[in-house]
Swiss-Prot record:
Gene3D superfamilies associated with the record: photosystem ii from thermosynechococcus elongatus
Modified residues (N-acetylthreonine): T3
Similarity remark: Belongs to the PsbB/PsbC family. PsbC subfamily.
Cofactor-binding details, from the entry: Binds multiple chlorophylls and provides some of the ligands for the Ca-4Mn-5O cluster of the oxygen-evolving complex. It may also provide a ligand for a Cl- that is required for oxygen evolution. PSII binds additional chlorophylls, carotenoids and specific lipids.
Gene Ontology molecular-function annotations: chlorophyll binding; electron transporter, transferring electrons within the cyclic electron transport pathway of photosynthesis activity; metal ion binding
Organism of this sequence: Ceratophyllum demersum (Rigid hornwort)
Name this protein carries in UniProt: Photosystem II CP43 reaction center protein
Residues bound to [CaMn4O5] cluster: E355
Propeptide regions on this chain: 1-2
């Protein structure tokens, strides 16, 4: 096998001499080869979908219906369960066949994508402009670029509407707030009021406000997808039909690397938002499948011991804790009755097992004395020992809890992975944006290939 370091190996217009990029620069060699770049992207999509299908089947094969999903390290089945497949009241899995079907469909799709990727990478035309002008492009062609942007927006809008149709017409989705501890239901009266939907965007991100992450009913979530899907589709049509205005032509850099940097920035934002969503939100990410949120596990612990000590005769309304504040109950800064002790910092928490015990002024003492249901006790005791605090050696739960289980919560995995990947994507955005701006300004030199040490070394073989 010849190496590229001695420059004799020609790769049909993809070698170092013709592109300025060595083999390890990956798709940079394909910047001007639209056909080969298509192959790389389709093959990449095939790898992604193959992972989804294979991992899906792996989780199905290892799934134990008697244990909660979050105790089994699952990250794909909780998403399918949230969409209402295979689950019944209380989030209990009653049928794993839909999960199997999902895995098989993804595997079949990945085979089609894989074949297309290999075809376009090896056999198809190097460039699409001559044979298929509709699919061809020049990076500098602003009109074509916004047309491609428009097509992408329409596809994203259709994706948002897929969730809407699932919730409205195809069996519904899982609602953790359904009475008695959660159930699958069809969403009937959507929230379409713009003041409600866009009100989320205007909220503070802090404390009890929580920006869009604070959404806690499915009507708002599905209604938001109606709005978002409509905006994406209308924006897509707009971008297909129009050319960029003068201010936009001046404001942006119009090159392949610039578009890459914009995409990386968008993905970084998505990653950071997803991190906060999966960490704090127990409506879009029901605790029955993903495990409790951190605040939820803490409040569940306070609730569990309130129940226990009340049974043992404690007067939970007036008992004092070691600091002189209420041991079980106290008041928040705004006057609501909240759980006392260290969990006071999580007094904003809203959870379906706790809300029935609230009155107009926070936790209702008479309900705490008379109305606590067994399912609420069971659920809080379970959540108390499954806090999303797993460490590297997988000792999950609160460290001092003797009943803690060996597990890392899927919330920990999903929040951490999306934060880390979002950060890497942001750094990639800065890198490629800097290079694209420098190239546009005309002073991007790159590495001086003539002085690169590796060129003077002997070939590997």
């Amino acid at each position: 096998m010849e190496t590229l370091f001695n420059g004799t190996l020609s790769l049909a217009g993809r070698d170092q001499e013709t592109t300025g990029f060595a083999w390890w620069a990956g798709n940079a060699r394909l910047i001007n080869l639209s056909g080969k770049l298509l192959g790389a992207h389709v093959a990449h999509a095939g790898l992604i979908v193959f992972w989804a299908g294979a991992m899906n089947l792996f989780e199905v094969a290892h799934f134990v219906p008697e244990k909660p999903m979050y105790e089994q390290g699952l990250i794909l089945l909780p998403h399918l369960a949230t969409l209402g497949w295979g689950v019944g009241p209380g989030g209990e899995v009653i049928d794993t066949f839909p999960y199997f079907v999902s895995g098989v469909l993804h595997l079949i799709s990945s085979a089609v994508l894989g074949f297309g990727g290999i075809y376009h990478a090896l056999l198809g035309p190097e460039t699409l402009e001559e044979s298929f002008p509709f699919f061809g492009y020049v990076w500098k062609d602003r009109n074509k670029m916004t047309t491609i942007l428009g097509i992408h927006l329409i596809l994203l809008g259709l994706g948002a509407f897929l969730l809407v149709f699932k919730a409205l017409y195809f069996g519904g989705v899982y609602d953790t707030w359904a009475p008695g501890g959660g159930d699958v239901r069809k969403i009937t009266n959507l929230t379409l009021s713009p003041s409600v939907i866009f009100g989320y965007l205007l909220k503070s991100p802090f404390g009890g406000e929580g920006w869009i992450v604070s959404v806690d009913d499915l009507e708002d979530i599905i209604g938001g997808h109606v709005w978002l899907g409509s905006i994406c589709i209308l924006g897509g049509i707009w971008h297909i039909l129009t050319k960029p205005f003068a201010w936009a032509r001046r404001a942006f850099v119009w090159s392949g690397e610039a578009y890459l940097s914009y995409s990386l920035a968008a993905l970084a934002v998505f990653g950071f938002i997803a991190c906060c969503f999966v960490w704090f939100n127990n409506t879009a990410y029901p605790s029955e499948f993903y495990g409790p949120t951190g605040p939820e596990a803490s409040q569940a612990q306070a609730f569990t011991f309130l129940v226990r000590d009340q049974r043992l005769g404690a007067n939970v309304g007036s008992a004092q804790g070691p600091t002189g504040l209420g041991k079980y109950l106290m008041r928040s800064p705004t006057g609501e009755v909240i759980f006392g002790g260290e969990t006071m910092r999580f007094w904003d928490l809203r959870a379906p097992w706790l809300e029935p015990l609230r009155g107009p002024n926070g936790l209702d003492l008479s309900r705490l004395k008379k109305d606590i249901q067994p399912w609420q006790e069971r659920r809080s005791a379970e959540y108390m020992t499954h806090a999303p605090l797993g460490s590297l050696n997988s000792v999950g739960g609160v460290a001092t809890e003797i009943n803690a289980v060996n597990y890392v919560s899927p919330r920990s995995w999903l929040a951490t992975s999306h934060f880390v990947l979002g950060f890497f994507l942001f750094v990639g955005h800065l890198w490629h944006a800097g290079r694209a701006r420098a190239a546009a300004a005309g002073f991007e030199k790159g590495i001086d290939r003539d002085l690169e040490p590796v060129l003077s070394m002997t070939p590997l073989n």
